[in-house]
Amino acid sequence: VVAVASADPGTSLHTLVQTRLEASGVEHPVTAVLLNFRAYDTLLEIGVLVVAGITGMSLSRAGARAEPELRSTNTLLHALARWFVPLMLLLAAWLLWAGSHRPGGAFQAGAVLAAAGVMMRLTGLPTAWIAPGPMLRLGLSAGFSVFLLVAAVGALTGRAFLAYPPLLSGPLILVIETLLTLSIGMILLGLYVAAAQRDGADE
């Protein structure tokens, strides 16, 4: 923000990002902006998403996440799921890794992870982590909590809020994005399950 305010009015934002890209810890300008230069925006967005996920799931019926009516008995879907779910998990991992140097990142990887979870729910594959308990609470909060912890440590050690140590920018961003991927995937899957239950209850 300070760099933009003090820059020549004729200098574009793209140029400013490119001149500081090497210090960001990643090679892709969008990831650099979202996880470094404007990381507090992303932190707030994740906080809103966590609150939305907790609220949505708290409105679903108690114990309903294990109800069998959300599952399909379609044998073709069940057979395809055993092939597609591992491929989707690999795709999510690739999108997460690719985000440092090309389009991708935690949000896209989390969406694919949630889609894999939806397919698992529909075919009856185990999804115990979406049931109420410590695993669900940890998954929902892990990304935001670690993001906030990194921000707080930076501020307490004399740097700006969410300013990473230069030598640790890349590894810290990778850790944050990995945990954000898991949290985003769990939140989206939880909202899908909660919405399906409410639709069934309204009929």
What is each of the regions a protein language model found here?
Residues 1-203:
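Alpha-helical transmembrane segments of multi-pass membrane proteins predominantly involved
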